Amino acid sequence: ETLLHTQIYQLRPEANIVLHTHSLAQTLMSMRYEQDGKIEFTGYELQKAFVGIKSHDGTVSLPIVANSQNMNVLCESVQALFAQDNFWGYLIAGHGIYTWGRDMIEARRHLDAFEFLLQAELAKLSYKL
């Protein structure tokens, strides 16, 4: 997985910290939305935790790529995501999240925000909201 970390540093020069974690919400939601290629969050005040987002009115997307044991294939899938301007992390289906920031505070804020949003959306599914 080192290749995925170094790829982010190459493709996002402003990134000085890359975080990668695995949680129940990340795993389940990435599997649930893998076919859509992303999860979209709209209307959450917490969206403002992401650099450049000033309002809850917009949509924040969290891309999802298919998992592969072939790191070259996985890196190619991830590289295609970086054509997008505004995104702060991505999910590998059935695996976990990668997120980044200019420093640990920013990277951790992005990670914590995504984790909350994923848990909120997972709860909405279970409550059929």
Model-found features: residue ranges?
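Glycine-rich flexible loops
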Residues: 1-129
